[in-house]
């Protein structure tokens, strides 16, 4: 682990320590990994509600005349599919079709788009957009201007309603409100596969919102949850994590994120390369693996058909919901691997039998 003094620190670290959190480095930040234990936090989120501090996530603002039009010419998804008050999953690609980052774009109005990239990639996204921005459009890095608090799980709406926060909104919609004189953006978004919300209060006022949420979450039978549970939850959903399922060398098509590309748009970063890859077909595809026997899968393991290597795992964990080892893996398309087929994974010299499945591993309940 990196020296804590060399890492960036969130606005709520003292509160997490008071709650007994254990910490680890993630994206250059010192973040809470668990409190009562990853499995307990995972199950609380699936069955009741979990509260996550994900303030390490980036924030950026694109503002100026035609800001939405500019962002639409740069990021992959088509902003014309949504409008003010809605959010959209999208990607910032390089010219070879690899992924600089995946992020959420919040459509404020035609002249203002708010972005939430991943922690480690915020500067790269801002730099890419600044380099292409037309006169009159500014791109600002607001990484430490806002905290991000995720309330996720079947009782998440009850938690927000208890506090008088807006909860009755469509998936991927958002609303700007005020809570105890603190401005808060409440978004119907998340990274767990459950009905949930992400709240963005100002960095310096995050404690007021966190304390109220923590009390309401506890009252609803939930608990604080760390990045360990966030990872097991997103892996069960098959959601990509940049640096694992997406990277400058892993394209959206390979990661099965082609749905987040506006193919009919005239311009976006990496368009020519991605159109060529779409025409030829990706050389590898992201698939799910579920262990047949006992054990845990991790990233970086070789996947084989017989004695022939056909791919590599990109993420792996033990699924608390399924009580089985699961993984995401990039599999060569010319290996002609099919869903339901058995493959083996080399787990430190042991051949582990796995079934190929199409994620998500458990039912999606976001809506």
UniProtKB/Swiss-Prot annotation:
The EC designation for this entry is 2.1.2.10
Disulfides per UniProt: none
Q: Which GO terms describe its molecular function?
A: aminomethyltransferase activity; transaminase activity
SUPFAM superfamilies according to UniProt: Aminomethyltransferase beta-barrel domain, Folate-binding domain
InterPro entries membership? GCS_T, GCS_T_bac, GCST_C, GCV_T_N, GcvT/YgfZ/DmdA, GcvT/YgfZ_C, TrmE/GcvT_dom1
Q: Which UniProt keywords apply?
A: Aminotransferase, Transferase
Single GO BP term: glycine decarboxylation via glycine cleavage system
Q: Report TM segments.
A: none
Cellular component, GO, one term: glycine cleavage complex
Alphabetized PANTHER family for the sequence:
AMINOMETHYLTRANSFERASE (PTHR43757), AMINOMETHYLTRANSFERASE, MITOCHONDRIAL (PTHR43757:SF2)
Q: How does it assemble?
A: The glycine cleavage system is composed of four proteins: P, T, L and H.
Q: What does the protein in this record do?
A: The glycine cleavage system catalyzes the degradation of glycine.
> What protein name is recorded for this chain?
Aminomethyltransferase
List the gene name: gcvT
